[in-house]
Curated annotation (Swiss-Prot):
Residues annotated with Phosphoserine modification: 211
Composition bias, Pro residues: 111-122, 558-568
Cytoplasm recorded as keyword: yes
Identification of the protein by name: Segment polarity protein dishevelled homolog DVL-2
Major location (coarse): membrane
Positions with biased composition (Basic and acidic residues): 159-171
Alphabetical list of Pfam families matching this protein: DEP, Dishevelled, DIX, Dsh_C, PDZ
GO cellular component: aggresome; apical part of cell; cell cortex; clathrin-coated vesicle; cytoplasm; cytoplasmic vesicle; cytoskeleton; cytosol
Effect of residue 63 to A: Reduces oligomerization. Reduces activation of Wnt signaling
Gene name tied to this protein: Dvl2
Organism field: Mus musculus (Mouse)
Keywords annotated in UniProt: Cell membrane, Cytoplasm, Cytoplasmic vesicle, Developmental protein, Isopeptide bond, Membrane, Nucleus, Phosphoprotein, Ubl conjugation, Wnt signaling pathway
A GO molecular function held by the record: small GTPase binding
Region annotated Disordered, chain positions: 93-255, 558-665
Length: 736
């Protein structure tokens, strides 16, 4: 291959400087024709080269920028590039690395002429050059004509784990390469405008053209440009007599690493137990503009990356496992990839999706999120910090088995996840760094929510990772239970689960206390039409309905039943829940207007009379106060309940001495239904003798004031509270 450049000489003549084949020193000729009218015939008449020689001239292409154009028509005018003509002359008797229109740098004279092209391996779908998106070939400015050296290397790595590759070094010596080597490189570098072939058998001690028995396992690295700092080039200079000529860049990647570019970054976990090799080729680049990084050149069929399907040619490789590829040289990246693939366990690839000006296949906008600039290095460091937010399960740090849809620590793999396990254990497994749930910073109403995840992602994760869900709807109910239990939290304390909302993990260090404190009866699980309602829990400091506090006292020991109710100052932590009480609730759950229990009737000697004023049982405390004149102690008439039928048998005559746990919302069950006793939900208390009994408000209305401040004259509702809270066997919680 030869290169030349020409500039305008004197009036009516053109100076032509050309490189002939592999010679290092250029030649200068003067052609007595103006530069704007010089043709190939004029150039040939001066050189008088053999007829089989090829002539390449430097020109500007509208799509690719600076290219080397072959001209064979003697009448064609030679392109004038910035007032000069740049050319390369290739003799027909010199073996060349390429027969494609773009000319290439010189081959060493030690390489024999290329035989017919061997077939490509079945794993490879395309070469690096032709597999990259169009955005990798922008127009290049004329500043490249200074021929300053830049470095751009590319390596195709077919990573195979099944058998080690050892070759005798004498088989692939410094001067001997197989005849198939040049043709293999020709096929693979067909998409490049320039290339300088550097045989690098040091990487794997295999030949470049190992295309027969070890085709998919060969490693090679080629440099498209000359660099005095290239380690590989220094080796080849020591090994070969002739120095490859200095070439200017003829193609460049688009600056996808600029801070103004928005990148969609994904993390892919690959199961290497099912596949023998990774199946990607990487392209590395660094230049004076600061653009750098390792890019996916092409993807080979049959590999782990091709089976996953999410990584595309042109994506930027940011991190592999815990190794950051930002600003890493191409040779170091090849070495790191080779070492990682040879180790057991899964491989986690963090890639930035490439921006393509013609998005048709793999370019998609992030879901429901604005596009913002991102720094890949900052993202990787943030991701590394995020992985330490939640401790993994005890066990080996390396995961022995992994499926394409899950990657759980060893502590969970042995036993698996099921709906019968503790919710906290399932949530901890979901919060593990390698669980597969996408947890990252989210933007909502211009507010950054750190370490958030989408509700639909939680449902999908539960449905695919937890055994026991017959359909996805059940997994959604389970996610609603996680929200009620406080294991996941909404940003604004929304207590109704929605798949379109962002959530964060709650306190995963607490045990049964943190789980029970947030449970309530008959809460909407979000699985029906009521899931569209935006039910918000109160902010801290608001009225406790339905308050979600934490336990501030030790559990007392269970105590035998007592026929006396506890004094109301001991029931100050009791909270009501659940909207307005209506006739759908059993009479035993109403706080007003019901018949005295057996204990109460025995003391008074006669039943309470019912007043017909209140029908709904949802009167406020102020209404009870207004009727205080009709209320008497000791069983006098003046009840404020409705005139409905007497309460169910199961709700009368029960010992009332129990204290409701904070945050529990008792509701009545359908009439006539016996309910099991749940010791987790109620604790029996030994009450002191009640000196004064006061009335409590019916359920469904938020308390206006503390129960301890209710006047002692309001006593008519004591019996209804008797029945609502007296029998723990009817107190139940339906978690799901």
């Amino acid at each position: 291959m030869a290169g030349s450049s020409a500039g305008g000489g004197g009036v009516g003549e053109t100076k032509v400087i050309y490189h002939l084949d592999e010679e290092e020193t250029p030649y200068l000729v003067k052609i007595p024709v103006p530069a704007e009218r010089i043709t190939l015939g004029d150039f040939k008449s001066v050189l008088q080269r053999p007829a089989g020689a090829k002539y390449f001239f430097k020109s500007m292409d509208q799509d690719f920028g600076v290219v080397k154009e072959e001209i064979s028509d003697d009448n064609a005018r030679l392109p004038c590039f910035n007032g000069r003509v740049v050319s390369w002359l290739v003799s027909s008797d010199t073996p060349q690395p390429e027969v494609a229109p773009p000319a290439h740098e010189s081959r060493t004279e030690l390489v024999p002429p290329p035989p017919p092209l061997p077939p490509l391996p079945p794993e490879r779908t395309s070469g690096i050059g032709d597999s990259r998106p169009p955005s990798f070939h922008p127009n290049v400015s004329s500043s490249h004509e200074n021929l300053e050296p830049e470095t751009e290397t590319e390596s195709v790595v077919s990573l195979r784990r099944d058998r080690p590759r050892r070759r005798d070094s004498s088989e692939h010596g410094a001067g001997g390469h197989r005849p198939g080597g040049p043709s293999r490189l020709e096929r693979h570098l067909a998409g490049y405008e320039s290339s300088s072939t550097l045989m690098t058998s040091e990487l794997e001690s295999t030949s470049l053209g190992d295309s027969d028995e070890d085709d998919t396992m060969s490693r090679f690295s080629s440099s498209t440009e000359q660099s005095s700092a290239s380690r590989l080039l220094k080796r080849h200079r020591r090994r070969r007599k002739q120095r490859p000529p200095r070439m200017e860049r003829t193609s460049s990647f688009s600056s996808v690493t600029d801070s103004t570019m928005s990148l969609n970054i994904i993390t892919v976990t690959l199961n290497m137990e099912k596949y023998n090799f990774l199946g990607i080729s990487i392209v590395g680049q660094s230049n004076e503009r600061g653009d750098g990084g390792i890019y996916i050149g092409s993807i080979m069929k049959g590999g782990a990356v091709a089976a996953d399907g999410r990584i595309e040619p042109g994506d930027m490789l940011l991190q592999v496992n815990d190794m950051n590829f930002e600003n890493m040289s191409n040779d170091d990246a090849v070495r790191v990839l080779r070492d990682i693939v040879h180790k057991p366990g899964p491989i986690v690839l963090t890639v930035a999706k490439c921006w393509d000006p013609s998005p048709q296949a793999y370019f998609t906008l992030p879901r429901n999120e604005p596009i913002q600039p991102i720094d890949p290095a900052a993202w990787v460091s943030h991701s590394a910090a995020l992985t330490g937010a939640f401790p993994a399960y005890p066990g080996s740090s390396s995961m022995s088995t992994i499926t394409s849809g899950s990657s759980l620590p060893d502590g969970c793999e042995g036993r698996g996840l099921s709906v019968h396990m503790d919710m906290a254990s399932v949530t901890k497994a979901m919060a593990a760094p390698e669980s597969g749930l996408e947890v990252r910073d989210r933007m909502w109403l211009k507010i950054t929510i750190p370490n958030a995840f989408l509700g639909s992602d939680v449902v999908d994760w539960l449905y695919h990772h937890v055994e026991g869900f017959p359909e996805r709807r059940e997994a959604r109910k389970y996610a609603s239970g996680l929200l009620k239990a406080g294991l996941i939290r909404h940003t604004v304390n929304k207590i109704t689960f929605s798949e379109q909302c962002y959530y964060v993990f709650g306190d995963l260090s607490g045990g049964c206390e943190s789980y029970l404190v947030n449970l309530s009866l008959n809460d909407n699980d979000g699985s029906s039409g009521a899931s569209d309602q935006d039910t918000l829990a109160p902010l801290p400091g608001a009225t406790p309905w339905p308050l979600l506090p934490t336990f501030s006292y030790q559990y007392p020991a269970p105590h035998p039943y007592s026929p006396q109710p506890p004094p109301y100052h001991e029931l100050s932590s009791y909270t009501y829940g659940g909207g307005s009480a209506s006739s759908q609730h059993s009479e035993g759950s109403r706080s007003s207007g019901s018949t005295r229990s057996d204990g109460g009737a025995g003391r008074t000697g006669r039943p309470e009379e019912r007043a017909p004023e209140s029908k709904s049982g949802s009167g406020s405390e102020s209404e009870l106060s207004s009727r205080g004149g009709s209320l008497r102690r000791g069983g006098e008439p003046g009840g404020t309940g409705d005139g409905g039928p007497p309460p169910s048998r199961g709700s009368t005559g029960a010992p009332p001495n129990l204290r409701a746990l904070p945050g529990l919302h008792p509701y009545g069950a359908p009439s006539g239904m016996a309910l099991p006793y749940n010791p987790m939900m109620v604790v029996m208390m030994p009450p002191p003798p009640p000196p004064v009994s006061t009335a409590v408000q019916p359920p469904g209305a938020p308390p206006v004031r503390d129960l301890g401040s209710v006047p002692p004259e309001l006593t008519a509702s004591r019996q209804s509270f008797h029945m609502a809270m007296g029998n723990p066997s009817e107190f139940f919680v339906d978690v799901m």
